[in-house]
Amino acid sequence: METTLPLPFLVGVSVPPGLNDIKEGLSREEVSCLGCVFFEVKPQTLEKILRFLKRHNVEFEPYFDVTALESIDDIITLLDAGARKVFVKTEQLADLSAYGSRVAPIVTGSSAALLSSATESGLLLSGFDQTASEAAQFLEEARDKKITPFFIKPVPGADLEQFIQVAAKANAIPILPSTGLTTKKDEAGKLAISTILSSVWKSDRPDGLLPTVVVDEHDTALGLVYSSAESVNEALRTQTGVYQSRKRGLWYKGATSGDTQELVRISLDCDNDALKFVVKQKGRFCHLDQSGCFGQLKGLPKLEQTLISRKQSAPEGSYTARLFSDEKLVRAKIMEEAEELCTAQTPQEIAFEAADLFYFALTRAVAAGVTLADIERSLDAKSWKVKRRTGDAKGKWAEKEGIKPAASALAATSAPVTKEAAQETTPEKITMRRFDASKVSTEELDAALKRPAQKSSDAIYKIIVPIIEDVRKNGDKAVLSYTHKFEKATSLTSPVLKAPFPKELMQLPEETIAAIDVSFENIRKFHAAQKEEKPLQVETMPGVVCSRFSRPIEAVGCYIPGGTAVLPSTALMLGVPAMVAGCNKIVFASPPRADGTITPEIVYVAHKVGAESIVLAGGAQAVAAMAYGTESITKVDKILGPGNQFVTAAKMFVSNDTNAAVGIDMPAGPSEVLVIADKDANPAFVASDLLSQAEHGVDSQVILIAIDLDEEHLQAIEDEVHRQATELPRVQIVRGSIAHSITVQVKTVEEAMELSNKYAPEHLILQIKEAEKAVDLVMNAGSVFIGAWTPESVGDYSAGVNHSLPTYGFAKQYSGVNLASFVKHITSSNLTAEGLKNVGQAVMQLAKVEELEAHRRAVSIRLEHMSKSN
């Protein structure tokens, strides 16, 4: 099994080493030498783990099960603190897709069907029982699927030696509990680390020894030795350099010479045929008068060694002694050399001045007791951060170079910032990039307005299609299994809640009931007004009457995202129009909470709109259940409602499957808003409208089109955005969204509306003078919010308009959900004999042109019959 991990397994530790006394299994020091550790994070342990990472995120390579964390911000904070990889619930993947391979799904069980949840970032299968009946099928399918990387965690009490063999057959990386491991000889009930390593390494020597490269903390090779299972065990037990002499048995490095080693890390190479020991070397490694068997140290390690030696023994009054004792001198020299480096011109000059700067900087570090390894660890730690400043120059250094604070924003690249880039460029101040439409090309502006790239459809389909097929074939059983797995609602025995709904499931505070009732009535009024008073009827020519009449779609499915979230607004926006339209069967679908219940707000709305049932599932499985129907879930004719990328992809998939015979409302993408503001706009209002959409997700985009605003007004809006954003609980999500959001400066309302129509926003907010007049210029938008007193929030909840709207530019082709979304229009034709005579010749001629003789004859036979009758 090939892996990029230092060792082909992770060590599972219940609490980070050092935060408690480890009384069983591996010690903190032993775990540190192995490096790769696995933790399960819970809300109550999060702060402890963050403190641990602050001190040890380079010493250890931590992997986390974060399924107990509901907050996306908390998970992002873990990534920023140095988590190498987090394993999340599948429904959290879309919100964390910006973090690429550092986020992977986790599923629980021993079924081969769970393997379909794998993504390009891999998969963690937790709670695997190698004794289960389905384990054999699992092994076979796991080998065929070739998931990379594939992690597997056993059930408690599993036989670890057998489990490792099973993992190897599945090409999986096992997660082994520290409590079941040991470095002691023949400790009953424990598996020796040396046994694990020797079972995977490959030696071509008759004696089975493995070549071992010994390096210092800078990865400088010190020498080549050999290791055995016994020597590795002893090295881990003592945390020292212990190797296998080909002649004299165990070799404790430095036992006689005093040139000892402190063991830092053990790892295998990519082919598992060589070991690497990272050590802190005291004295020399080589028996000759040189630091290592391959020669003396060079470069920065050599300089550090020299400085440490001089610090201990520099003659009093020497220049080196002055540097170590005179902080002002060192500071002045660092400033001097930094300036000389900045003014150097040729490559030779730059190398020369950089070397001088490094010398004085390292002198400053050594004087403070900071090693080169400490500096390298700090660099490595920074490489794992996902929240970063832009790196703009500040204070007197910026002033000296003539750099103004806003210059970096004005000079920002016009290329769109992807979600991947958002994790790399998180500014200290939350601010949108600015573009002056009069100073950039059309191409540059189009690129800046480009929406964030979404996860590839292939990657999403790889996840959802097996789920859809499973539900289609196995019905209720499949839906229940996914609800148990994804929502942890293991107590559920039925995947659906049928009406009438028990009163105890909709117990709510009076103020919540009142708010829902007000919103219900406003939404009902607005959608009822959309009803056609009577069928359309037109006599196109004498005797030819054409009509169009509407009929409700008989069965509709309303998808309501949720689980722990409470989303009565979406239930209202879908359920009320369906009720007004007269749909015979209204089916809600929403993921239940862990106890198997639906939030009472949604049950109450379902009761008010007369819903037939509530499907207790979310994601692709809920969409599939409504599209195909199951033993207990009603098949619907149309599915409506928002969701993440997986829900949207599932809706698209079933709508293209003729076996499902189901329609959907519209394609969907991340939420977005475009605000047009002029000098009359209140900066606080503008900022609040921008942030109301930015908090939806890191892939949301918000656009401000500023009409003839001066620097003071623009700065006031930017200040409000930052101030309000930092007060929000979802501030890190806002940072990700703002990273690909922009302000465009224009001169006129007409110019602003032209840009808006080109962008076709989901939400368009007009905070301008005489906003009502500008509505005439709107050609493409999901919903428009007019004037200073109309925040987008009222449309989301209670005004009456629908909040299920086209995104990602689809407002050019689609309407938002409305009454027409729940009805279909049927046309009819009613001809008299005179009418057929009037239109018959035209019909027959066109049928003749298209060579459809039966069509022509259907008219000619009737006309001949008329002639004979006369």
UniProtKB/Swiss-Prot annotation:
Source species of the chain: Neurospora crassa (strain ATCC 24698 / 74-OR23-1A / CBS 708.71 / DSM 1257 / FGSC 987)
Gene3D superfamilies linked to this entry: 1.20.5.1300, MazG-like, Nitrogenase molybdenum iron protein domain, Phosphoribosyl-AMP cyclohydrolase
HAMAP family in the record: HisD
Gene encoding the protein: his-3
Region (Phosphoribosyl-ATP pyrophosphohydrolase): 286-367
Name used for this protein in its record: Histidine biosynthesis trifunctional protein
InterPro entries assigned to the protein according to its UniProt record, in alphabetical order: Ald_DH/histidinol_DH (IPR016161), HisE (IPR008179), Histidine_synth_trifunct (IPR016298), Histidinol_DH_CS (IPR001692), Hstdl_DH (IPR012131), PRib-ATP_PPHydrolase-like (IPR021130), PRib_AMP_CycHydrolase_dom (IPR002496), PRib_AMP_CycHydrolase_sf (IPR038019)
Catalytic site positions: E762, H763
UniProt KW keywords: Amino-acid biosynthesis, ATP-binding, Histidine biosynthesis, Hydrolase, Metal-binding, Multifunctional enzyme, NAD, Nucleotide-binding, Oxidoreductase, Zinc
Tree of life domain: Eukaryota
Any single GO CC term annotated in Swiss-Prot or TrEMBL for this entry: cytoplasm
Residues annotated for Zn(2+) binding in this entry: Q693, H696, D796, H855
